[in-house]
């Protein structure tokens, strides 16, 4: 039985009329300023949080390393996610915000480009890898660290318009 995917083509842009995956052709799109912000959190025991805050981790600079990893990951998104376009990124900002109420860290990433397609995946990848790196750097202190609530907060630019989480 052959399935007709043509009616889905407009909504499912990464599928062709036969249902096979494809990379979207953005060659006719106009370059515009695109920006996306993503967030996540890393929860840990109070003792682990305090050790990181004091700089007492056996692996060294936990927060600095996680920040650099997030920046590097945003730049490598097209290598990690098969149908993402490689983009020239003009700005990547990563914040690891101490949150004693979790306890742990809120992670935020903002990515900006002037391109034909958006940077949502780059922002989400930056947060994800920063969180994974924080875990890796702190796992000698605690194995039960939890990575939570990775999500897109906002995006601007492009034909689909702006988005902001409610």
UniProtKB/Swiss-Prot annotation:
The keyword Zinc-finger does not apply. Keywords: Lyase, Molybdenum cofactor biosynthesis. Catalyzes the conversion of (8S)-3',8-cyclo-7,8-dihydroguanosine 5'-triphosphate to cyclic pyranopterin monophosphate (cPMP). The gene is moaC. The keyword Lyase applies. Pathway: Cofactor biosynthesis; molybdopterin biosynthesis. InterPro entries: MoaC (IPR023045), MoaC_bact/euk (IPR047594), MoaC_sf (IPR036522), MoCo_biosynth_MoaA/MoaC (IPR050105), Mopterin_CF_biosynth-C_dom (IPR002820). Signal peptide: none annotated. Belongs to the MoaC family. Substrate binds at residues 83-85, 121-122. Pfam families: MoaC. It catalyses: (8S)-3',8-cyclo-7,8-dihydroguanosine 5'-triphosphate = cyclic pyranopterin phosphate + diphosphate. It comes from the Bacteria. This is Cyclic pyranopterin monophosphate synthase.
